[in-house]
Amino acid sequence: APSMMVFGASWLTIFVGSLMATDRNSSFLMRLLSTPLRSVDYILGYSIPVLPLALLQGIASFATAMIFGLSLNLGTFYALLVLIPVALLFISLGLLLGSAFSSSNAVSGFGTILVNATVFLSGAVLPIEMIGGGFEAFCNALPFAHAAKAVQLALAQDLNSLLLHLFWVLLYAFLFFIPSVWIFKKRMKG
């Protein structure tokens, strides 16, 4: 279930990025720019409404996993809470793509590569510990393995080990969010 949740959340990147790129090329965003909102307000307006969608995806993933034997317990609730920072990671990536690329086709192309990279670099297909070495170090330098591990640890109710992985996920979300605001602001002025 943790890998399914991270895989599902990775699709939020394409959704948010495509929505942003489409809005930027339409008159909808031009009308919004006449309001006294700041760039960060627009970015938050794309981010916050997607969080309930991420939670619904998580609930659907757990419902499917329960069909295959996952038991409902407090860890399930913790994992849904951990899904919020994981979703913020992928939402911030979508914001970055939507701000950087001018068409939804470009966002979709790059986003599809990102979804596939997430699957392989998070250990969803094959545990990265089995491969080890440089590949494991590379995966651990990226947020995807930490996202899957955070959900896995939350599900196991190992909250002490969870914090380091959540730190990595939130750090990357922040690192993707800041340039999104800057690029969006620059593109809207130009």
Would you name each region that the model predicts?
Residues A1-L19:
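Long, hydrophobic alpha-helical segments
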Residues T13-L37:
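Transmembrane helix boundary and interhelical loop/hinge segments in multi-pass membrane proteins
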Residues T13-V16, N25, A60, S92-L93, ...:
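Hydrophobic/aromatic residues in alpha-helical transmembrane segments
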Residues V16-L19, R31, D41, S103-G109, ...:
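Residue-level recognition of specific faces of alpha-helices
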Residues T22, R31, T35, A65-M66, ...:
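Transmembrane helix-loop junction
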Residues S39-N116, D158-L170, F174-I178:
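Alpha-helical transmembrane segments and their short interhelical loops
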Residues S122-F176, K189-G190:
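Membrane-interfacial helix-loop-helix junctions in multi-pass membrane proteins
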Residues W182-G190:
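Short cytosolic juxtamembrane segments of multi-pass membrane proteins
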